[in-house]
C-alpha cells in the first residue's frame, strides 16, 4: 500500500502541535530564580530560544517570555540571568526595546516576517554568475528605501570577468552611482577590494542580503576567518545557489562595526507593498512625482505622465523604468496567486 505524502498545511499543523507539546513541557523560570534585569542584544535567533550578548560581552542562551512573539537579531532587549543553567538555558528575555528600524519580507503563510532590526546599512550582494540581474538589485533597493536604511551595492566574483566584461559591468553599476547609490566590485576568492569593504563595514551595524550563491558565506569567511561559514556550490540544474546559512547571526568585526548574516533568499517578494510604496522605492522618481497630469497616473501609457516624460528626456534610466513596471506586474501576479496574510 502506497504512503500518502503530507501536504504543506498538514506538515505545518504537525509541527505546530509538536511545538506546543514541547512548550508545555518546557521548564518555566520562577521569579526568585532570576537575577536583576540587564540590557543586551540579540546576536542569534533560534527556533525556540535566542542568544543574548550581555553588556560585558558574555553570550547567554535564553528562553523568551510567552508574550514576546517576534524577537530578531539586532533587537535590544532586557533580560535576566538564571541562578543556574537548566536544560541548556541560562536566562530569560523579558522585553524588547523599541526598534529604530527593521528589515522585513513577506512570507506566504505567516504574513510579514521581520528578519533583523536596528540596522545602519544594508549590503546588497550580487554576483556575475550565472548573470548580473539589475531587476533583483532594484527589488532590494525598493525594500531599502521603504525601510529607510542606506544601501551599498556589492558585486562579488569579479575575478571571473574579462577586462571587457568588467567595463560592461561598470557601465551597469553606473546606473546606480548616477542616482546616489554607492557600489563596490570585489572578489572574496582573490581578496580584491576586500579592504574597501572593511572600511564600509567599520561603523554601525550592517546586514548582508542577496540570493543564494552570490558568495555571502565566502565574504564572511574573508572578513571573519574564525567563523568558517559553510559555503555552497551553484546548482548545475537551476543555476541557483544552495542555502548555506540556517540562522541569522550578528558578528563583531575586528576593524569595528557589526555584521548580520541572514539566510539566503532566492525570492525577496514585494507583494506586501502597495504600488505606491514600490513607486516611492525609486529614489529618482521622488522629485518628479506629483507632476503627472492625472493623480492616479500609473506611469505607463497614461497621457501627461511626468515620469515617462523624464525617461524620454534621459533624466531617468530606461532600464530602471522597465524594471519598475516588472516589479509592479510581478507583485500583482504573485498576490493574486497566493493567500497572503497581512
Curated annotation (Swiss-Prot):
Gene Ontology biological process terms, A to Z: ribosomal small subunit biogenesis
Subcellular location: Cytoplasm
Span of domain CP-type G: 100-268
Entries under Pfam families matching the protein: RsgA_GTPase
Domain of life where this protein originates: Bacteria
EC number: 3.6.1.-
Cofactor, how bound (note): Binds 1 zinc ion per subunit.
InterPro entries according to UniProt: G_CP_dom (IPR030378), NA-bd_OB-fold (IPR012340), P-loop_NTPase (IPR027417), Ribosome_biogen_GTPase_RsgA (IPR004881), RsgA_GTPase_dom (IPR010914)
Residues reported in the UniProt entry to bind Zn(2+): 292, 297, 299, 305
GO cellular-component term (any): cytoplasm
Binding site for GTP: 156-159, 210-218
Cofactor: Zn(2+)
Any one GO molecular function term: rRNA binding
Function description: One of several proteins that assist in the late maturation steps of the functional core of the 30S ribosomal subunit. Helps release RbfA from mature subunits. May play a role in the assembly of ribosomal proteins into the subunit. Circularly permuted GTPase that catalyzes slow GTP hydrolysis, GTPase activity is stimulated by the 30S ribosomal subunit.
Protein name: Small ribosomal subunit biogenesis GTPase RsgA
Source organism of this protein record: Haemophilus ducreyi (strain 35000HP / ATCC 700724)
Amino acid at each position: 500500500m502506497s504512503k500518502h505524502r503530507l501536504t504543506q498545511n498538514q506538515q505545518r499543523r504537525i509541527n505546530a502541535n509538536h511545538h506546543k507539546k514541547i512548550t508545555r513541557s518546557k521548564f518555566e523560570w520562577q521569579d526568585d530564580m532570576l537575577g536583576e534585569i540587564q540590557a543586551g542584544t540579540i546576536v542569534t535567533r533560534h527556533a525556540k530560544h535566542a542568544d543574548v550578548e550581555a553588556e560585558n560581552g558574555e553570550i547567554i542562551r535564553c528562553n523568551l517570555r510567552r508574550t514576546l512573539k517576534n524577537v530578531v537579531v539586532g533587537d535590544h532587549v532586557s533580560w535576566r540571568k538564571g541562578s543556574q543553567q537548566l536544560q541548556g538555558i541560562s536566562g530569560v528575555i523579558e522585553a524588547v526595546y523599541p526598534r529604530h528600524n527593521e528589515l522585513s519580507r513577506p512570507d506566504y503563510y505567516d504574513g510579514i516576517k521581520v528578519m533583523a532590526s536596528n540596522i545602519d546599512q544594508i549590503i546588497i550582494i550580487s554576483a556575475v554568475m550565472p548573470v548580473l540581474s539589475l531587476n533583483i538589485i532594484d527589488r532590494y533597493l525598493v525594500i531599502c528605501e521603504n525601510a529607510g536604511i542606506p544601501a551599498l551595492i556589492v558585486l562579488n566574483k569579479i575575478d571571473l570577468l574579462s577586462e571587457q566584461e568588467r567595463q560592461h559591468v561598470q557601465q551597469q553599476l553606473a546606473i546606480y552611482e548616477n542616482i546616489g547609490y554607492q557600489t563596490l566590485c570585489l572578489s572574496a576568492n582573490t581578496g580584491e577590494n576586500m579592504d574597501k569593504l572593511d572600511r564600509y563595514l567599520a561603523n554601525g551595524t550592517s546586514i548582508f542580503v542577496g540570493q543564494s550563491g552570490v558568495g555571502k558565506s565566502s565574504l564572511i569567511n574573508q572578513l571573519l576567518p574564525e567563523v568558517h561559514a559553510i559555503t555552497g556550490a551553484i546548482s548545475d540544474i537551476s543555476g541557483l545557489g544552495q542555502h548555506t546559512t540556517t540562522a541569522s547571526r550578528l558578528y563583531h568585526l575586528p576593524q569595528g562595526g557589526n555584521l548580520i548574516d541572514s539566510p539566503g533568499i532566492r525570492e525577496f517578494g514585494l507583494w506586501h507593498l502597495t504600488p505606491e510604496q514600490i513607486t516611492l522605492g525609486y529614489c529618482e522618481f521622488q522629485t518628479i512625482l506629483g507632476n503627472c497630469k492625472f493623480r492616479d497616473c500609473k506611469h505607463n501609457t497614461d497621457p501627461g505622465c511626468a515620469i515617462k516624460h523624464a525617461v524620454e528626456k534621459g533624466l531617468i534610466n530606461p532600464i530602471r523604468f522597465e524594471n519598475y513596471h516588472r516589479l509592479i506586474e510581478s507583485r500583482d501576479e504573485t498576490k493574486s496567486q497566493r493567500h497572503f496574510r497581512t
